[in-house]
Amino acid sequence: MPTINQLVRKGRTDKVWKSKSPALNKGFNSLKKKSTDISAPQKRGVCTRVGTMTPKKPNSALRKYARVRLTNGIEVTAYIPGIGHNLQEHSVVLIRGGRVKDLPGVRYHIVRGALDTAGVDKRMQGRSKYGTKKPKAAKK
């Protein structure tokens, strides 16, 4: 609890709000070669590296990730959800916000089924999250 004198000297400071996905809050004007403050729900980018990394302490796996250079010039690390993927260097992908709790520094997800990213094969439930089309009904 501050004293009255401390409050007179310093005062109360407002909490600074910080974005959880800052790369989506920057645009780029290619004609003027300047960054803009226009935010977007998703952004397009090109994969510069595709690989696997291991998660933090209690978990154990090989999580798939991609380094993506976005259209605004920022390079970010994005998680590739689902089982199996067709991404390689120079693939064009769409990223959305959303961190992966056990991978430090990964704040974005790649959208499956958009641009060069294929949907997850043989997925029956939760298909919309993995870009999988509805399977054809079996003939009787």
Curated annotation (Swiss-Prot):
Residue list for modification 3-methylthioaspartic acid: 102
Disulphide-bonded residues: none
Species: Bacillus cytotoxicus (strain DSM 22905 / CIP 110041 / 391-98 / NVH 391-98)
Subunit note: Part of the 30S ribosomal subunit. Contacts proteins S8 and S17. May interact with IF1 in the 30S initiation complex.
Role played: With S4 and S5 plays an important role in translational accuracy.
Record Pfam families: Ribosom_S12_S23
Keywords: Methylation, Ribonucleoprotein, Ribosomal protein, RNA-binding, rRNA-binding, tRNA-binding
Protein name: Small ribosomal subunit protein uS12
